Swiss-Prot record:
SUPFAM superfamilies: Sm-like ribonucleoproteins. This is RNA-binding protein Hfq. GO terms for cellular component: cytosol. CDD domains: Hfq. GO terms for molecular function: RNA binding. It comes from Syntrophomonas wolfei subsp. wolfei (strain DSM 2245B / Goettingen). The gene is hfq.
Amino acid sequence: MSKSQINLQDAFLNQVRKDKIPVTVFLVNGFQIKGMVRGFDNFTVIIEVDQKQQLVYKHAISTVAPLRPISMLNLEAKSDDD
């Protein structure tokens, strides 16, 4: 991936992490995890639920839904700065 392309997944996860926006993570098996994104890498996301952390593999995630809207303009501007 070239530097000029926006990595939307990383920008989205980083935005909800930095702004401490609660998310609902829907897994492919139907389970839902409601908590805060604490970190992520290429393969996993760390979600904090009730002061406990869960490591979730990205291939098990179908959807990440923030509890409040995030600005897509902020995501694009931050990605363009890289």
